[in-house]
């Protein structure tokens, strides 16, 4: 499966966020905080974004790049809470447009921008940003070395990269890797030590690599329960068969995490 197709059919969509917000708030203008319970399409919610912000050294004066920004939930959170300026780069046209619309909805377009582009050829000048962040996205990119080299290029001297991603443990088999690629465009799943080496080769210093697998296990269980609670909504969008296929495949994904074959990692380094 192509990554664009995977996110076109992802349960958490712009419309899902808007519907959830309308159920929670019936009147009045919206602020960024009104979206936070619904627009954080990553593991660990706002706390996870806060940790990345600390690892990346983000302050109010920071120029931040969110690589593979999706619907822009973390970018809006950073701009709202840290008062920094954030640019999100996103390959999927629908999600890039959704990020722009949601950002305008909460009147943060003066601090958050989105550019449609490819993470392996970032459309930005060298040294433009003070910090780069990304969350659970690089598994979709075959040439991880190119992404990390581009992140290093667009960072100013002393700037920092911090990101999370899925990692493979030794017991993850070739057949399971192929199924992950076919279902969710996980073209390559790197190991913890593999990422550490790639960061070093890209020129990053003071590299840190943390295994989050135990922390993510209960989160991924809850995500499966959440998707199953969205059955009516997802059946309308994708049909009964489409819903059943997604449920079966997500259950397979959760089983890999439960069995210790797949996990999460957090990485950081200085330019």
Residue ranges and their predicted role:
Residues 208-271:
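Conserved Class I S-adenosyl-L-methionine
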Residues 145-160:
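A short glycine-rich, Lys/Arg-flanked "PGG" loop and its adjoining helix->strand segment in the class I
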Residues 187-203, 209:
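Short alpha-helix
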Residues 1-32:
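N-terminal, positively charged/glycine-rich alpha-helical extensions of SAM-dependent methyltransferases
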Residues 120-131:
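A short acidic, Gly/Pro-enriched loop at the edge of an enzyme's catalytic core
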Residues 27, 42-60:
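Conserved alpha-helix/loop element of class I SAM-dependent methyltransferases that forms part
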Residues 63-67, 71-121:
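Class I SAM-dependent methyltransferase SAM/SAH-binding core
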Residues 166-186:
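Short, glycine-/aromatic-enriched active-site segment of Class I SAM-dependent methyltransferases
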């Amino acid at each position: 499966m192509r990554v664009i197709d995977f996110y076109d059919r992802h349960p958490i969509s712009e419309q899902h966020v808007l519907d959830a917000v309308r159920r929670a708030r019936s009147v009045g203008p919206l602020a960024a905080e009104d979206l936070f319970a619904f627009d954080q399409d990553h593991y660990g919610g706002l706390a996870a974004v806060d940790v990345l912000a600390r690892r990346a050294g983000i302050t109010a004066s920071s120029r931040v790049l969110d690589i593979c920004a999706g619907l822009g939930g973390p970018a809006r959170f950073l701009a709202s809470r840290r008062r920094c300026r954030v640019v999100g780069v996103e390959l999927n046209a629908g999600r890039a447009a959704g990020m722009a619309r949601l950002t305008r909805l909460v009147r943060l377009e003066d601090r958050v921008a989105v550019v449609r582009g490819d993470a392996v050829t970032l459309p930005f000048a060298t040294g433009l940003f003070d910090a780069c962040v990304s969350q659970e996205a690089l598994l979709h990119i075959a040439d991880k070395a190119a992404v990390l080299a581009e992140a290093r290029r667009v960072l100013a001297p002393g700037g920092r990269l911090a990101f999370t991603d899925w990692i493979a443990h030794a017991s993850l088999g070739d057949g399971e890797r192929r199924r992950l690629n076919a279902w969710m465009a996980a073209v390559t799943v790197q190991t913890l030590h593999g990422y550490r080496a790639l960061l070093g080769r890209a020129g990053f210093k003071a590299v840190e690599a943390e295994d989050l697998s135990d922390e993510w296990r209960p989160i991924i269980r809850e995500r499966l329960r959440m998707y199953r609670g969205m059955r009516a909504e997802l059946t309308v969008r994708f049909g009964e068969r489409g819903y059943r296929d997604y449920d079966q495949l997500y259950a397979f994904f959760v089983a890999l995490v439960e069995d210790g074959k797949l996990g999460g990692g957090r990485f950081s380094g200085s330019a």
